[in-house]
Amino acid sequence: MNVLDNSVIIKGSKNGITVFLDEEMPFEELLENVSDKFKNASKFFNNATMAISFDGRNLSAEEEKRILNVISDVSELNIVCVLDENNDIKSVYEEAVKKAMNSFNISHQPERQKITDPKTTCMFYKGTLRSGQVFEADGSVVVLGDVNPGGKVVAKGSVIVLGSLKGNIFAGVDGNENAFVVALEMSPMQIKIGDIIARSSDSGVNKISKGKNKSKILEPKIAYVYDQNIYVEDLEQNALDDISLD
């Protein structure tokens, strides 16, 4: 029993959670213990968004993938990224934001110019914005958490939410329609970019709509202005491939 209890240990950290794994236990048995541990802890974590790291055992890419799939199956955790001991989470996020701020090439709009954000200032907000809370930024902003219904982000630049976006976003407040909004889960009450507004109640396939079937698998999306409308599309790999760092 002690072997089972100690084969998988979950500890919280300032960046998320660290999972300590037994080095000697056969992987298939360890995988079952991971399932049991996260199933028992699912109510504690709820649908939190966080980074995860593994310690105590060297994992192959396939083993790591299987563990993440098990965690997704038995819990509501939204895993933003996997860190190793050499990762600094702020550096990881800053690199991601730097890429996003340079340019996004929308795969389904080849005639559209790349979306660029001239703002060089980027602020970070770590935590959940709850109903009634407002975060304002003079440039662009990255939210390391969720924006709940009634929460609001106001930014002169672009907004990236590394979590669930279910509140209100106002990007490009100075009329900058080149600003954009990215979220790991895009279900906002309202998005405003420049002078263009889209609400969750709007009709039309190109505008924001609430998803009918919530999936635990995150599908990052980007919202941007084109032809005086706000479009929401999947943030696909071929869009990321076109990003260049200056």
Curated annotation (Swiss-Prot):
InterPro entries cross-referenced by the UniProt entry: CAP/MinC_C, MinC, MinC_C_sf, MinC_N_1, Septum_form_inhib_MinC_C
Record-level GO BP terms: cell morphogenesis; division septum assembly; regulation of cell septum assembly
Superkingdom, natural source: Bacteria
Keywords for this protein: Cell cycle, Cell division, Septation
Family label: Belongs to the MinC family.
Subunit structure, interactors included: Interacts with MinD and FtsZ.
Its biological purpose: Cell division inhibitor that blocks the formation of polar Z ring septums. Rapidly oscillates between the poles of the cell to destabilize FtsZ filaments that have formed before they mature into polar Z rings. Prevents FtsZ polymerization.
The protein's name: Probable septum site-determining protein MinC
Source organism (scientific name): Lachnospira eligens (strain ATCC 27750 / DSM 3376 / VPI C15-48 / C15-B4) (Eubacterium eligens)
